[in-house]
């Protein structure tokens, strides 16, 4: 079966909500035509939506390797790398004794790769807040809110960190 037929099957699986089968179909298309960057790209997108980060990264990198001039492929690769950095930061934050400097570093990397990632801004706010750096925490929460004005957690964090920053300023003035 040619790669295109597997791609059609993958899209049919996506429409029916079976992402695992869609990924298998994309991988069959890739096996039929390993040098087709579009197949790797499509597979990577579906893997990313399923939070299969390693597989998403591998296929995104291969798409860029095969078609380095494709802007969409390079942008998608950066998005996958950003999501992985966010996931690593989240894992670090759940540790018993998080290394906040490391978390902030990972989140800054994620935001360099994808500045529209509101989750990275929220985690950045939480990390700065945990360090008592309330002004920076409020700024990060404000950025998340700017990207997603209806985000309830961003609203709450922004108000909380702004209030804490003001209190801290008053204490240092007196």
Residue ranges of predicted features:
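Conserved structural position within tetratricopeptide repeats
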Residues: 27-31, 62-65, 108-112, 143-146
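TPR-repeat structural position
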Residues: 19, 53, 98-100, 134
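Helix-start (N-cap) detector for alpha-helical repeat units in TPR-like alpha-solenoids
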Residues: 2-4, 37-38, 71, 78, ...
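Structural motif corresponding to the intra-repeat A-B loop/turn of tetratricopeptide repeats
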Residues: 16, 50, 95-97, 131, ...
């Amino acid at each position: 079966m040619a790669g295109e037929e597997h791609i059609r099957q993958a899209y049919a699986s996506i429409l029916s909500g079976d992402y695992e089968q869609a990924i298998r179909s994309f991988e069959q298309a890739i096996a039929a035509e390993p040098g087709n960057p579009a197949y790797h790209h499509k597979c990577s997108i579906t893997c990313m939506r399923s939070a299969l980060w390693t597989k998403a990264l591998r296929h995104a990198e291969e798409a860029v390797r095969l078609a380095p001039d494709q802007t969409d492929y390079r942008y998608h690769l950066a998005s996958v790398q950003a999501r992985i950095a966010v996931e690593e930061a989240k894992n670090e934050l759940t540790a018993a004794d998080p290394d906040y400097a490391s978390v902030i570093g990972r989140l800054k990397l994620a935001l360099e790769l994808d500045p529209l990632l509101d989750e990275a801004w929220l985690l950045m706010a939480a990390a700065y807040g945990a360090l008592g750096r309330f002004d920076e925490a409020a700024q990060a929460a404000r950025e998340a809110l700017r990207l997603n004005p209806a985000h309830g957690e961003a609203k709450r964090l922004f108000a909380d960190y702004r209030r804490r920053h003001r209190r801290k300023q008053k204490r240092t003035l007196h």
